[in-house]
């Protein structure tokens, strides 16, 4: 198991008691690894895919607990050399799905709208945690430190940089083919867990 997967598994165990923080984390997860599903009569749904089973379970719990969805779940073997499993959750197109996307500040046409759930520092931490869980990687602190998050949305990448700057994290952004990469090489730790007894720190996040 890679160091990144170890960190993601640890983050996926963190319990968030505040719904606003759960929603902020879910929003970033969907923006990072989600896509729209179209239906008839202007109905919309969504699809979320990840290679981490703990992250998939976390998204499933959030969708069921906070928004009343019962997503279908699929597991398939990846096509790459290691053939890692890919876990996919699907919320079928419906009026409820469209209402959910509007509530989350996600516009099916524009792709990314201004985030309505980033008022407190805890919500911002949860948002960054979601972005990392959805599309981040990190090297071991003992080696040359490097944290990066990859997205296909320029606006989302810019928002990640802005949110990281709130915590005085000097993140930078670059583009690679069709992706935008937010990265940081200088070590800095920001607590992302609300649990006082168990507060794992991700260097740079």
What are these regions (language model features)?
Residues 1-44, 51-55, 73-84, 125-128, ...:
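Sequence-level preference for short, compositionally simple segments enriched
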Residues 50, 56-57, 61-81, 88-205:
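DNA-contacting interfaces and partner/effector-binding or oligomerization modules
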């Amino acid at each position: 198991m890679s160091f990144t997967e170890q960190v993601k598994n640890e983050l996926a165990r963190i319990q968030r008691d505040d719904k606003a923080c759960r929603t902020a984390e879910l929003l970033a997860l969907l923006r990072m690894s989600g896509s729209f599903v179209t239906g008839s009569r202007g109905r919309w749904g969504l699809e979320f895919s990840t290679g981490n089973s703990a992250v998939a379970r976390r998204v499933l719990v959030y969708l069921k607990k906070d928004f009343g969805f019962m997503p279908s779940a699929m597991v398939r073997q990846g096509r790459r050399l290691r053939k890692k499993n890919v876990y996919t959750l699907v919320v079928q197109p419906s009026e409820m799905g469209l209402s959910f996307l509007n509530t989350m500040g996600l516009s099916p046409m524009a792709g990314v709208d201004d985030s309505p759930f980033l008022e407190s520092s805890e919500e911002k931490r949860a948002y960054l945690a979601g972005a990392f869980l959805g599309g981040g990687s990190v090297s071991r602190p003992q080696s040359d430190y490097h944290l990066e998050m990859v997205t296909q949305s320029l606006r989302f990448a810019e928002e990640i940089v802005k949110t990281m700057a709130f915590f005085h994290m000097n993140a930078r952004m670059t583009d690679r083919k069709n992706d935008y990469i937010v990265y940081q090489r200088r070590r800095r730790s920001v607590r992302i867990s609300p649990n006082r007894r168990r507060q794992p720190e991700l260097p740079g996040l």
